[in-house]
């Protein structure tokens, strides 16, 4: 692992396997018992891009109080079970010392994970320590990453899986310039409750079309220099909306990525979208009027160009018809319907052979 990775540093006894309450040692095969739902949860976490590292204190391992051979048999069986089911640990880190030995490797000290911290391997924002003891949470704090305290009743493996993979896809962007003051907030997994106010009634309606047909919630508040014209208001709103959508999508793992829409009323609107990470716009629509309501028709293409710049998407968008109002509305509606397909979560894999979007 040369680049930074999302790593789960997982305790063994009491987290992966049941810790015997009598002597706290898994030193016989008949004492080996997996924690509930640990294997399917770890498999799903691997699919979500997490690497697995086991980090465990084993008091007095290799001494008369805990002979190495007593540890090896159940530990090796556990590892064989995990491997046979597709669960792969990149590393198994073991501290064999007693607490009174005052070693540098015993959790919550950093000795066992020193190589990961100094080698630039850890994605600090997304890596997690998982364990049942306070020392595991202290290790997480010392590593400057998140800690989750495992408890089979209140925070078992099903809950941990949900916590780490079902993240709220929300974002808020505030953009303030000399011309505009804008706040855009989106929630990609909620619908309805849109609150849009840009000072341009027709533009508000078009933004609502994107959110409604896109199947997500949008709040958009804009204070712009409309006493001059609508250029900065529309351009900066598009930039803020594209940025908010990109931030809410996160690493894009599990999304559909692509979308295609072909709505047909009296206008034929076509939209093809790829959340590719690369901005590109192909736009084809002609208008016979300079304005529709309070919206300059020349700003329609500029809106979508600005949006593709910050969303970093490839967008092909066209519409043909006789009524400018309907043409513009069909463009926004088609984009919304296409965006709905592209942002829909369909699994856990990243939809790219390159490993990044």
From Swiss-Prot:
One Gene Ontology cellular component annotation held by this UniProt entry: cytoplasm
Domain of life (superkingdom): Bacteria
Where does it localize? Cytoplasm
Active site location? 11, 13
Q: What keywords sit in the KW lines?
A: Amino-acid biosynthesis, Cytoplasm, Histidine biosynthesis, Hydrolase, Lyase, Magnesium, Metal-binding, Multifunctional enzyme, Zinc
> What cofactor(s) does the depicted protein rely on?
Mg(2+); Zn(2+)
Q: Where is this region: Imidazoleglycerol-phosphate dehydratase?
A: 169-357
> What is the protein name given in its UniProt record?
Histidine biosynthesis bifunctional protein HisB
Question: Which organism was this protein described from?
Answer: Vibrio parahaemolyticus serotype O3:K6 (strain RIMD 2210633)
The gene it comes from is hisB
């Amino acid at each position: 692992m040369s680049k930074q990775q999302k790593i789960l540093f997982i305790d063994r006894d009491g987290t992966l396997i049941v810790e015997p309450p009598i002597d706290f040692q898994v030193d016989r095969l008949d004492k080996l018992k997996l924690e509930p739902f640990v294997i399917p949860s770890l498999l799903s976490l691997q699919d979500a891009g997490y690497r697995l590292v086991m980090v465990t204190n084993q008091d007095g391992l290799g001494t008369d109080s805990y002979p190495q051979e007593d540890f090896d048999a159940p530990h090796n069986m556990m590892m064989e079970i995990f491997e046979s089911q597709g669960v792969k640990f990149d590393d198994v880190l073991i501290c064999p010392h007693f607490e009174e030995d005052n070693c540098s490797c015993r959790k919550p000290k950093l000795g066992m994970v020193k190589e990961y911290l100094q080698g630039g391997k850890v994605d600090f924002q997304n890596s997690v320590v998982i364990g049942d003891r306070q020392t595991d949470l202290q290790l997480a704090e010392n590593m400057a990453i998140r800690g989750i305290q495992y408890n089979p009743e209140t925070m078992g493996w099903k809950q941990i899986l949900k916590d780490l993979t079902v993240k709220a896809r929300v974002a808020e962007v505030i953009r303030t310039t000399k011309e505009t003051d804008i706040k855009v907030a989106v929630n990609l997994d909620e619908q309805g409750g849109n609150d849009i106010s840009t000072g341009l009634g027709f533009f508000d309606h078009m933004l609502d079309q994107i959110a409604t047909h896109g199947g997500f919630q949008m709040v958009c508040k804009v204070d712009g220099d409309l006493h001059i014209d609508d250029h900065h208001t529309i351009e900066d709103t598009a930039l803020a909306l594209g940025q908010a959508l990109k931030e809410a999508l996160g690493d894009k793992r599990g999304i559909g990525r692509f979308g295609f829409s072909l709505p047909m009323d009296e206008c034929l609107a076509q939209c093809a979208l790829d959340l590719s990470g690369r901005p590109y716009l192909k736009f084809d629509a002609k208008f016979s009027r300079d304005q529709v309501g309070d919206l300059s028709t020349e700003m329609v293409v500029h809106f979508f160009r600005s949006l593709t710049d910050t969303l970093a998407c490839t967008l092909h968008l066209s519409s043909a018809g006789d009524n400018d109002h309907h043409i513009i509305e069909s463009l926004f509606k088609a984009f919304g319907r296409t965006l709905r397909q592209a942002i829909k979560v369909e699994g856990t894999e990243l939809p790219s052979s390159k490993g990044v979007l």
